[in-house]
């Protein structure tokens, strides 16, 4: 019967875990954040409460366009000379000796950010943050046109320190250059980007590769060593690879445009003032000086005419320092007209943030699961840290009765509500946010902030909604800019990991959120970091599990002794059950009285279960939040389970598995076969087989079958959990098996209870003040006439209330004699 008790506790643990999981998932859906009420995204001009930003207005430098250009600045569109084709520029480097931790790629078409790669290295020289879903080699980002050409693939940019830049060829100085045409890779002919990607899939980091290019009509064979793929924290949606989601649109990040001229401004859901050209589609003049890249764009009178304005100029500068996760940005709008103009600009936020693991990850947020893979976070003096779910933005965009954009603060908001500390896009392990310039605590010169999506809401599949491309924008204060003057603003763009020390240094500490179980998750994370000094986080999880289970050993032994005591009580409990088989209340009370008399607490054996549940949840939260566990490998010599914060991904079956099971976001199992969850389920079943006694009746057999089925169902839910969590379960299960075998040998051989006491307690009618009461008197189960007492009878006896005489039923009442005619009595 000890095994029977263990069986019941194991069944209770599985049942409670499943119930907790199902209730938790239901609450996540039930309490998903409601859509905020529609706000006026555009305030009336007469009702503006934001003072003109006169302190940001400055005279335009004489060296800048617009100063002294006279009539040239007011010429029509046809006279404005612009480059015929875009150019790409880079800041930072992938070279580990350069000191840079980022490689930024900028595009002159729109003057925005096309790509940001994190290139920081570990002490062993490997990338600290790589693409966890890519195992092939990396040549470098080339900004190549994906369409096919007759010659090959045109190289538009080569990042410093990339394998393409470090390639060598006989008699040629330097590596690949912009303008080269790639015609072959590893002796395979390639003429479009998809063919090059297919050829790259056959490579591995560290391998040597041959790249054939056409330069000045001459074929050159370059040799280079491929590297790991760095994490592209910002990228175009069309470059998402396997994570590309239908409906997400490709748009550069941090684009700058004219937000307002006079009384005309951008309407909600639009990118430009009605009738004006989108500056994101125009090619800007570009120049680079070391770590600074500048872009300039002039809009002529005719281009400004739809806004009832005159010629203006847009300028912006990007700067990057070594060992910094922030990109400095200076933006300005110049008045190139002959009279003053009311001007304001709009700067868009980042978009295309990494989607890694969106189909299996569980991002922790205060929104009860309403969080998407990419959410908007911001902090103001009035509201503190806030999160706007990508789910809510997509649902808002699908609702035609509401504006596409969700206002975060408006021109008529109180000043503290517009005192902005940061605003950005938040992913599971990374954040990209706009910050005040260094030395300044907040931004006070923006009159409006709003969150939106860079996607076609009708084209995003329902099962991929959490991967929607979320972004935001900021509208500057309105300034009356004199001729030849400018409205300027300095900003920083943080793009980096959610490491506590890094985030605190940039004022973004609130973006790291553990939720309700932070009191467990944070200490567990600290212990894991301590144990990681052994050199492997998988081994650290094993050590953590052994430490926890070792500390719980006294409780486990006590639970085993409790099960042994339950075995001694089992015959008497069975007698009580048979005696009161028709009276559930009497049976439960008699069993409780027996347990109290002998000093037995049936809940004492549940302590290990209740202690393990918070540890399980805390470890799950740690794996979902702590970036140190991202990319932590099971072993350095294998690519299997190379990310303990993700499924182990032993085998890719997405090419042939039914999409309902193996699809990204659409399947129950995902595109990879994972072996660790199978081992976990096998160990659970083995424990049940080893320690569950044979069924003695039909009810016990049914219970055992149900437990087996529930274990299999639990394996279905666990199929996509992080590999680190599976290692915890495997270690804990193996410990449990060994512990049961050891404890069973150390249990006392003598009985815990006196058999005479057990028989006397079971035979008695109850306990009164700790003494056995064998009478069937006032508290007995039968009345004086021998009939069983009802619950009402027993309640009245305890309360001392005499029984009231019940009114006779209608059928039992005596009818009065009828007085029909002719029925009189004779005298």
Swiss-Prot record:
InterPro entries: Membr_insert_YidC (IPR019998), Membr_insert_YidC_N (IPR028053), PDZ (IPR001478), PDZ_sf (IPR036034), YidC/ALB3/OXA1/COX18 (IPR001708), YidC/Oxa/ALB_C (IPR028055), YidC_ALB_C (IPR047196), YidC_periplasmic_sf (IPR038221). Residues 58-78 have a biased composition (Acidic residues). SMART domains: PDZ (SM00228). It is found in: Cell inner membrane. Residues 84-94 have a biased composition (Polar residues). Residues 812-827 have a biased composition (Basic residues). GO terms for cellular component: plasma membrane. Residues 58-94, 758-827 are annotated as: Disordered. It is a multi-pass membrane protein. Keywords: Cell inner membrane, Cell membrane, Chaperone, Membrane, Protein transport, Transmembrane, Transmembrane helix, Transport. Residues 1-217 form the PDZ domain. One of its GO terms (molecular function) is membrane insertase activity. Pfam families: 60KD_IMP, PDZ_2, YidC_periplas. Residues 782-801 have a biased composition (Basic and acidic residues). Disulfide bonds: none annotated. GO terms for biological process: protein insertion into membrane; protein transport. Residues 218-827 are annotated as: YidC. It comes from the Bacteria. The chain crosses the membrane at residues 11-31, 524-544, 598-618, 666-686, 710-730. Belongs to the OXA1/ALB3/YidC family. Type 1 subfamily. Interacts with the Sec translocase complex via SecD. Specifically interacts with transmembrane segments of nascent integral membrane proteins during membrane integration. Required for the insertion and/or proper folding and/or complex formation of integral membrane proteins into the membrane. Involved in integration of membrane proteins that insert both dependently and independently of the Sec translocase complex, as well as at least some lipoproteins. Aids folding of multispanning membrane proteins. PANTHER family: CYTOCHROME C OXIDASE ASSEMBLY PROTEIN COX18, MITOCHONDRIAL (PTHR12428:SF65), OXA1 (PTHR12428). This is Membrane protein insertase YidC. It comes from Rhodopirellula baltica (strain DSM 10527 / NCIMB 13988 / SH1).
């Amino acid at each position: 019967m000890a095994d029977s008790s263990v069986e019941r506790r194991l069944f209770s643990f599985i049942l409670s875990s499943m119930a907790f999981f199902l209730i938790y998932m239901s609450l996540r859906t039930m309490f998903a954040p409601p859509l905020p009420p529609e706000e006026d995204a555009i305030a009336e001009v007469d009702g503006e409460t934001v003072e003109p930003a006169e302190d940001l207005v400055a005279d335009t430098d004489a060296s800048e366009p617009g100063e002294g250009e006279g009539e040239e600045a007011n010429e029509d569109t046809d006279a404005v000379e612009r480059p015929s084709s875009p150019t790409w520029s880079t800041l930072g480097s992938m070279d580990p000796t350069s000191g840079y931790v980022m490689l930024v790629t900028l595009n002159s078409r729109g003057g925005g950010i096309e790509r940001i790669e994190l290139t920081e290295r570990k002490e062993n020289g490997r990338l600290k943050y790589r693409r966890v879903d890519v195992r092939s080699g990396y040549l470098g980002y080339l900004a190549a046109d994906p369409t096919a050409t007759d010659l090959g693939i045109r190289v538009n940019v080569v990042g410093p320190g990339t394998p393409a830049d470090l390639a060598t060829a006989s008699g040629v100085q330097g590596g690949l250059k912009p303008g080269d045409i790639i015609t072959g890779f590893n002796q395979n002919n390639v003429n479009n980007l998809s063919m090059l990607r297919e050829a790259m899939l056959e490579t591995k980091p560290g391998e040597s590769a041959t790249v054939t290019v056409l330069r000045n009509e001459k074929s050159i064979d370059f040799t280079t060593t491929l590297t790991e793929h760095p994490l592209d924290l910002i990228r175009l949606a069309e470059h998402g690879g396997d994570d590309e989601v239908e409906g997400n649109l490709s748009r550069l990040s941090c684009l700058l445009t004219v937000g307002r001229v006079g009384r005309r401004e951008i309407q909600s859901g639009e990118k430009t003032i009605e009738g004006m050209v989108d500056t994101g589609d125009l090619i800007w003049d570009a120049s680079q000086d070391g770590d600074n890249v500048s872009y300039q764009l002039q809009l002529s009178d005719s281009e400004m005419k739809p806004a009832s304005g005159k010629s203006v100029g847009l300028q912006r500068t990007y700067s990057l320092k070594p060992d910094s996760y922030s990109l400095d940005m200076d933006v300005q709008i110049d008045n190139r007209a002959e009279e003053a103009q009311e001007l304001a600009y709009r700067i868009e936020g980042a978009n295309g943030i990494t989607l890694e693991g969106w189909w299996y990850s569980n991002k922790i947020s205060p929104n009860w699961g309403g969080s998407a893979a990419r959410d908007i976070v911001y902090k103001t003096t009035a509201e503190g840290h806030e999160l706007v779910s990508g789910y809510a933005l997509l649902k808002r965009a699908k609702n035609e009765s509401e504006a596409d954009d969700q206002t975060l603060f408006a021109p008529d908001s109180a000043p503290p509500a517009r005192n902005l500390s940061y605003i950005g896009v938040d992913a599971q392990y990374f954040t990209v946010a706009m910050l005040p310039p260094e030395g300044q605590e907040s931004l006070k010169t923006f009159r409006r902030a709003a969150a939106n999506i860079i996607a076609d809401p009708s084209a995003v599949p329902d099962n991929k909604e959490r991967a929607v491309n979320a972004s935001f924008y900021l509208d500057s204060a309105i300034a009356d800019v004199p001729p030849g003057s400018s409205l300027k603003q300095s900003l920083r763009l943080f793009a980096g990991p959610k490491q506590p020390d890094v985030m605190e240094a940039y004022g973004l500490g609130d973006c790291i959120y553990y939720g309700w179980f932070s009191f467990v998750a944070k200490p567990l994370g600290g212990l894991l970091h301590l144990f990681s000094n052994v050199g492997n986080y998988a081994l650290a999880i094993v050590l953590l599990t052994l430490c926890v289970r070792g500390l719980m050993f006294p409780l486990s032994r006590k639970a085993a002794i409790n099960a042994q005591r339950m075995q001694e009580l089992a015959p008497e409990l069975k007698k009580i059950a048979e005696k009161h088989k028709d009276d559930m209340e009497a049976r439960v009370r008699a069993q409780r009285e027996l347990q109290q008399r002998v000093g037995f607490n049936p809940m004492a054996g549940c302590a290990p279960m209740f202690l393990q549940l918070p540890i399980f949840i805390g470890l799950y939260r740690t794996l979902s939040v702590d970036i140190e566990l991202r990319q932590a490998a099971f072993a350095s010599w294998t690519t299997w389970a190379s990310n303990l914060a993700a499924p182990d991904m032993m085998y890719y079956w997405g090419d042939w598995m039914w999409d309902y099971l193996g699809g990204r976001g659409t399947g129950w199992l995902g595109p990879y076969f994972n072996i660790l969850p199978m081992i976990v389920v096998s160990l659970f079943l083995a424990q049940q087989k080893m320690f569950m006694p044979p069924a003695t009746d039909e009810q016990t057999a049914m219970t055992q079958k149900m437990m087996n089925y529930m274990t299999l169902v639990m394996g279905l839910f666990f199929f996509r959990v992080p590999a680190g969590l599976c290692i915890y379960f495997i270690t804990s299960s193996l410990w449990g098996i060994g512990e049961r075998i050891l404890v069973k040998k150390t249990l006392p051989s003598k009985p815990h209870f006196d058999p005479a006491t057990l028989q006397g307690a079971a035979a008695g009618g109850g306990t009164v003040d700790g003494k056995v009461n064998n009478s069937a008197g006032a508290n007995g189960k039968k009345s004086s006439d021998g009939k069983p007492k009802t619950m009402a009878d027993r309640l009245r006896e305890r309360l001392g209330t005499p029984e009231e005489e019940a009114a006779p039923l209608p059928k039992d009442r005596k009818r009065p004699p009828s007085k029909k005619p002719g029925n009189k009595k004779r005298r």
